[in-house]
Amino acid sequence: MNAVAPISVRVNPNVDANTHPYISTGLAENKFGVDADVALSMYKKAALSDSLKVCGLDYHIGSQITEIAPFIEALERALELVEKLKSENILVEHLDIGGGVGVSYDDEKIINIEDYLNSVTNRAKEMKILVEPGRSIVANAGIFVTRVEYLKRNNLKSFAIVDGAMNDLIRPSLYESFHQAVLIDDNSIGINDNWDIVGPVCESADFLAKNRNLTLEKGDYIAIMTAGAYGFVLSSNYNSRPRVPEVMISGKQHSLVRKRETIESLFENESLFEDGTNQ
């Protein structure tokens, strides 16, 4: 075929992103990438091959990062490897710095993206820079709307049991992450209390928010904010719950872009085991 395949190597720069450990991907203890010495050896072997062309160096140190320092530390370690490659006459055309820029879920101070990119381009000079933004683009473009089904109070806790659950938005259960919970109609005449907003799934990890001061009554709608990233894509059919629909809004226009699943759709790809007894 005489094809020449372009290659990039994902390097693990061993940098602590100071984020939740489940979404840290740039430490030596994480499963991603190879260390700089291994990468150097890989590049040398690739440079000797007639079927491979070295074109880039990649890294990604994690997600929901709210400080610029880890990004710069990772960049500088990557550029050290680029210089070593130059000394071996191996030229890297692009540097893929991944994504990871965090957003504000709970009034966190976040990175100024312009300052971050200026820091990158000032250091990387004439290299082509690839960036993989995700959360920083879509997180605040989505909200999860859920309805209060029941209010339940005991001597210790007050629960707002809603129709949404951990299968719909698992981030609070998986990462103990914080999402703002906003009452859509702020004229509710219900009960004011500090509510745990919980779903109907059969485990205590099923919560969307805890200890939120709201005035609620049955039938109220609550908006769980900043749900556009790692929301629907992490949803499941746990407890045989059909996934929710998605509605896109633009100005005063709205359109159903993903219809609600049905109980029937949960089983449409299943079939009986054909062992001769169910003929």
Predicted ranges, named:
Residues V11-V15, I61-I65, G99-V103, R135-I137, ...:
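Glycine-rich beta-alpha junction loops
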Residues R77-L81, E88-D96, V101-I143, E149-Y150:
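Glycine-rich phosphate/ribose-binding loops and adjacent secondary-structure elements
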Residues N2-A3, L48, S87-E88, I110, ...:
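Short, glycine- and charge-enriched coil/turn segments that flank and shape catalytic ligand pockets
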Residues S119, E126-Q279:
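Charged (often Lys/Glu-rich) extended helix/loop segments that serve as interaction or gating elements
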Residues M1-H94, V103, S119:
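Active-site-proximal beta-alpha core segment in soluble small-molecule metabolic enzymes
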Residues Y22, E29, L52, D58, ...:
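Short glycine- and Lys/Arg-enriched binding-loop motifs that mark or flank ligand-binding interfaces
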Residues A17-S24, I68-P70, Y105-I110, N140-F144, ...:
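Short acidic, glycine/serine/threonine-rich loops at helix termini
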Residues V34-D37, S41, A69, E73-E76, ...:
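Conserved active-site and cofactor/substrate-binding residues in soluble primary-metabolism enzymes
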